[in-house]
């Protein structure tokens, strides 16, 4: 099973790659997504949002999210995991809020955003790259955050078992976990929890 809680030590990871189904997960980084071919579905919390070529999405840190590809044709996107440390002037927004809808439609995405994403693909994550990456992330946030309607991030939750499972992993990822302990702590049966693992996190 692939990890569903990721603690990214790197400041920035970015790649353009073929999109695929990615099960629910969360991490301390913000995730930036720009569809370059085809279509993609991004789920944040319990909501699913459709993305087409040119659309941009921003997933704030510590929010459970996943990806699905329903298009039979190729789908590619630029995916970036960026530490909030790259955007110190936006710390409060990134920690306390999140967009009602994380997707900005292609026609509303400003050219600066695409330029910054493409530029980060070019510059290596070396010492001079870090300064450039910080500048590019600041540009992206400065140009996209005003386009979002924000809500308190504590309101993006759910009592559903998948959400509870991922949240549990996030809170206890440094501990040794067993199916019986986790089921007990979540107040569900071991067989129900086992079905979540086999059906969702395969």
Model regions: which residues?
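A short, Lys/Arg-enriched amphipathic alpha-helix from helix-turn-helix/homeodomain DNA-binding modules
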Residues: 110, 153-177, 181-186
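A hydrophobic/aromatic-rich effector-binding and dimerization subdomain
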Residues: 1-15, 59-128, 141-150
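Generic detection of well-ordered alpha-helical segments
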Residues: 138, 142, 160-163, 167, ...
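Solvent-exposed, amphipathic alpha-helical segments
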Residues: 38, 112-126, 161-172
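All-alpha amphipathic helical-bundle segments outside canonical DNA-binding/catalytic cores
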Residues: 123-139, 156-159
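Basic/polar phosphate-binding segments, predominantly the helix-turn-helix DNA-binding elements
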Residues: 176-202
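Generic protein-terminus/edge-of-domain signal
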Residues: 1-56, 63, 71
